[in-house]
Swiss-Prot record:
Keyword annotations from UniProtKB, A to Z: Ribonucleoprotein, Ribosomal protein, RNA-binding, rRNA-binding
BP GO terms, sorted: translation
Described function: Binds together with bS18 to 16S ribosomal RNA.
HAMAP family: Ribosomal_bS6 (MF_00360)
Pfam family, one: Ribosomal_S6
Gene Ontology, cellular component aspect: cytoplasm; ribonucleoprotein complex; ribosome
A GO molecular-function descriptor: small ribosomal subunit rRNA binding
Family: Belongs to the bacterial ribosomal protein bS6 family.
InterPro entries linked: Ribosomal_bS6, Ribosomal_bS6_sf, Ribosomal_S6_plastid/chlpt, Transl_elong_EF1B/ribsomal_bS6
Protein name per UniProt: Small ribosomal subunit protein bS6
Length: 95
């Protein structure tokens, strides 16, 4: 298991109260493959440095995960297929 940090930028038209539950459905992939979710931190709506798909704002969420590389790749793939996800970035922490 490796430690990862995942940043997700979501469509700003989403209701901010539904962000954490909708992310939780994606994070079930990690739990099903034996990984753990250490922390989910929803930053809320922030201005983007540049427009993404004609959006000037996005809802940011940062998630700390312990999982295998294959599990994180599958999570990133599923997030990429969702239309409400504007951008994802996965970073591996070096300890």
């Amino acid at each position: 298991m490796r430690h990862y940090e995942l940043m997700v930028i979501l469509d700003p038209s989403l209701d901010e109260r539904t962000v954490a539950p909708s992310l939780d459905t994606f994070l079930n992939v990690v739990r099903q493959h034996g990984g753990t979710i250490d922390k989910v931190d929803v930053w809320g709506k922030r201005r983007l440095a540049y427009e993404i798909l004609k959006h000037a704002e996005g809802i940011y969420a940062v998630i700390d995960i312990n999982a295998t590389p294959a599990t994180v790749a599958e999570l990133d793939r599923q997030l990429g297929l969702n239309e409400s996800v504007l951008r994802t970035k996965v970073l591996r922490h070096n300890k």
